[in-house]
């Protein structure tokens, strides 16, 4: 209560757990709960790790063409594109059979990486037809990891918890808190879509087209 005797309304925690479907046991965790998941990872930090069949997460080792050839990398998604980051680009790999996609992202909690979630996920999915694909940034822990987590959520029907638990078994990652909040928002959006599809089956006896 304020000094004037007016009740003070407590602000809601925008990052508490959110349950979209009351018939589903799953609830999207709050941001702090998501951070705690990374403490359970056992993988040691190395330059490059295969975190999903055909998908590698790495650091600035992406400049090392010999390593790329040894790993038989055919596609590169650079989430630290640009002259102030890991400035490679398609021309850097012109002597190699590599498809390149660059995103000029910054490892800042205020940077909106979510606008690239779907375009990056589509590039990853297309790259796996070859494969192999490297997603990298400067350290291979935040930007690149966030995009791989988003891919697993969008195309492999994983929750954000499932995706994190899958990747931390194989690589030491830690997206910044802003990116975690963006993944959390994606998780809620995808949960709503799944709930809508389930309701479509229940109500009409047939599955509606996915949104």
Swiss-Prot record:
Substrate binds at residues 136-143. Its EC number is 3.1.3.16, 3.1.3.48. Gene3D superfamilies: Protein tyrosine phosphatase superfamily. It is an enzyme of class 3 (hydrolase). One of its GO terms (cellular component) is cytoplasm. The keyword Thylakoid does not apply. It catalyses: O-phospho-L-tyrosyl-[protein] + H2O = L-tyrosyl-[protein] + phosphate; O-phospho-L-seryl-[protein] + H2O = L-seryl-[protein] + phosphate; O-phospho-L-threonyl-[protein] + H2O = L-threonyl-[protein] + phosphate. GO terms for biological process: negative regulation of MAPK cascade; protein dephosphorylation. This is Dual specificity phosphatase 29. The lineage of its organism: Eukaryota, Metazoa, Chordata, Craniata, Vertebrata. The gene is dusp29.
